[in-house]
Design a protein with these regions (language model features):
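Short, small-residue-biased leader/transition segments that mark boundaries at the very start
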Residues: 1-2
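Conserved SAM-dependent methyltransferase scaffold
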Residues: 6-7
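Conserved S-adenosyl-L-methionine
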Residues: 11-18, 82-84
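Conserved hydrophobic residues forming the short capping helix/wall of the S-adenosyl-L-methionine
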Residues: 13, 34-35, 105
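S-adenosyl-L-methionine
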Residues: 19-60
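Short SAM/SAH-binding signature in class I
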Residues: 58-67, 87
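A short, conserved alpha-helix within the catalytic core of class I
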Residues: 70-78
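C-terminal substrate-binding/active-site "lid" region of AdoMet-derived donor-dependent transferases
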Residues: 77-133, 137
């Protein structure tokens, strides 16, 4: 299911409010459909780019970045200007993104880097082997003014 991170966050925090920011029109449509289908009523879907929309949102407790299309440095700069400390989680798939996020977050308070490996089994003769998918790195840290 495409764009599932926002819905997963919403289901984990049913009394919280999730703001999902997306700039691609097709992805916006899919996200809205998935929210309706899965009754994720506490998700507000916003059209735009995160680096543009972030300043218009209420100050968050947590931020998840599932992709930034090259805007991570600007998004991080805005997060560092928030008036309170927030939990920041960033997923990085490509080597370029992993290197960039590692460099930009290397001095972040409480930084954790968590490699996530997944795969699917497939049959080879009478055996089953695990066909790995690309690893993803999750970066978790504290950001904002009081960090």
């Amino acid at each position: 299911m495409y764009k599932r991170q926002s819905i997963t966050c919403a289901k984990c925090c049913p009394y919280g409010q999730v703001y999902a920011v997306e700039y691609q029109e097709q992805a916006l449509d899919i996200l809205r459909q998935n929210c309706a289908y899965l009754q994720a009523e506490n998700v507000t879907v916003l059209a735009g780019r995160a680096e543009t929309v972030l300043s218009e949102l209420p100050v968050p407790d947590c931020i998840f970045i599932g992709g930034s299309n090259g805007a991570f440095p600007e998004i991080l700069r805005q997060i560092q200007q928030l008036p309170k400390s927030v939990r920041l989680v960033v997923s990085a798939v490509t080597l370029e993104t992993q290197a960039e996020v590692t460099q930009l977050l290397q001095d972040a308070p409480q930084l954790e880097i968590i490699p996530v490996f997944s795969g699917q089994s497939r049959k080879v003769g009478r055996y089953h082997v695990l066909q790995p998918y690309h690893p993803v790195l999750l970066f978790a840290c504290t950001g904002g003014k009081s960090s």
